[in-house]
C-alpha cells in the first residue's frame, strides 16, 4: 500500500497548491478488518484516501492511485463504513464510505423479431459509479476494441455489427455504450421461443449453498434498470407470456420487479433490481438464497410466439 499512500500525499500537495482544502481519510481496508469505535488503534490503520472539502460540512472522496474511478467512486476494498477524517489540528470525525456514490446500470433495447427467429436491434446502456469504473477497466485492459467487442458478443451470445462508447476516457461518473446486434431465438415448427429480456441480469443463482456459516458481504449497493421493446413479426401472436413479478428481501432492502405487457404487435418489458444492504448475517441467508433463486428463474423464462 506504500505506492497508494505516496500518490495520495502528492495529490494532497497539489490540491493545497491549488487552494483546495483536503484531508487524509485513514482506515483499515475491508479485507483487513473493521476499525473499532471504542479503541481505534494506529496499528489498525493500513491506508488512506483523500477527502476534499465540498462545503463547510461535506466532503467528497478520491483515491489518487485509481485510474478508473471518479469523485466518490472508490475501489470496493476501500468502501468501509468506518473511516476517520483527520480534518486538521485535533479535529477528526468518523465518516461512512460504504455508499458514497450511485452505482447504476440502465439499459434500453429496441428490437424487431423476424419470422426466422432472428432478433435485430440496438441496446443503449448507461453505466454509473462502480459500473462505469468496471466498464472502463475491462475496456482499457483488453488488447484492443475488437477483442473487447468479441468478448461481449460471446458472453451475450449475440453478433455485434456496431459498437460505440461515450466518456470511456473522460474523468466522469458515467460511460455510455451503444451496440447494434443480432440474436437468434429458437424456432420450432410454427413457434418462436425467446427470452424477452434479450440481455439478462443474471442467468443463475449466485448462492448455491443451502446453508452458510459466514456472512454475505456485497461490495457495493446497486440499481439495475432494463427496458425492452420488441416488435412481433407479422402473422404471429403471443401464445405464452411470463407472469409479472415483484419480490423483496425480508428487510425490504433488496427488491426486484418484472413487468411484461403486449399491445398490438409490441412486447414491452420493464425490469428493476435494487440492492442497498451490504451485509447479510448467516441467519438471513435462507431468505437471500430464495430471493436470488426467484430472480434467476424469472430471468430465464421465455415468451412463446405462435404463427397464425
PLM regions and their residue ranges:
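A sensor for short, sequence-defined functional sites
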Residues: 2-308
